[in-house]
């Protein structure tokens, strides 16, 4: 079998869901429940994740050319020290497959991310157990998300202004009678740092932008 495009997921205000934490956001996304984030304007100091201008559905081979560029998203209104959890799910699949996943993300300010497999059990998608090797409990960390109210402040040059990149591979579980159904769920937890101590009146925006490309080889 050949490696084929499966799906591109991007930050937006329709398919991304909020939660009190990453686990709840992931459950909400997997089951299309809860509330969606707000779009926020790009702040001047933020980079922007964008496709090439000619990467469109009109090209001979552009598997994700019809997917719009990602939005900057947040749970408005933003506040100092605020932490917001987001998640998005893939389409449902059943056939055992080898998957390749490529993630690129930026957040103001600190973020954690996790990629998990969910399975439809009874009437609900829940986190699959055990998780396939390559997903498991690996938590991606950028910045220091856990201490904003203890004094982490934005200082120049801002040490959080990096675009983060990650990739992984995994094999989905066996499905001999074709009754099992799965989803890939990407979740984030993003923290807005406190304003710079010597410039307390400066604006303190918050936002998340991401793309995740998924390819697979059906076994």
Language-model features: locations:
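Local beta-strand/beta-hairpin segments that build beta-sheet-rich folds
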Residues: 126-146
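Short, surface-exposed beta-strand/strand-loop-strand elements in extracellular ectodomains
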Residues: 110-132
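Beta-strand-rich recognition domains
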Residues: 1-115, 140-219
């Amino acid at each position: 079998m050949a490696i084929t495009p499966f799906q591109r997921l991007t930050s937006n205000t329709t398919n991304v869901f909020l939660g009190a934490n990453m686990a709840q956001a992931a459950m909400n996304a997997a089951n299309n429940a809860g509330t969606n984030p707000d779009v926020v304007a790009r702040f001047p100091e933020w980079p922007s994740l964008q496709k090439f201008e000619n990467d469109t559905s009109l090209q001979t081979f552009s598997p994700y050319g019809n997917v719009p560029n990602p939005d900057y998203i947040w749970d408005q209104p933003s506040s100092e020290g605020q932490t917001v959890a987001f998640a998005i799910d893939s389409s449902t699949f059943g056939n055992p497959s080898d998957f390749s996943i490529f993630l690129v993300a930026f957040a103001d300010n600190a973020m954690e991310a996790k990629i998990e497999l969910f399975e439809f059990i009874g009437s609900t998608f829940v986190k699959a157990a055990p998780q396939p090797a390559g997903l498991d409990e690996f938590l991606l960390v950028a910045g220091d998300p856990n201490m904003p109210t203890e004094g982490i402040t934005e200082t120049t040059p801002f040490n959080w202004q990096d675009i983060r990149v990650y990739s992984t591979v995994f094999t989905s579980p066996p499905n001999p009678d074709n009754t099992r159904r799965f989803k890939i769920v990407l979740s984030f937890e993003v923290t807005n740092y406190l304003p710079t101590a010597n410039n307390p009146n400066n604006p303190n925006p918050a936002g998340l932008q991401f793309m995740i490309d998924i390819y697979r080889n059906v076994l």
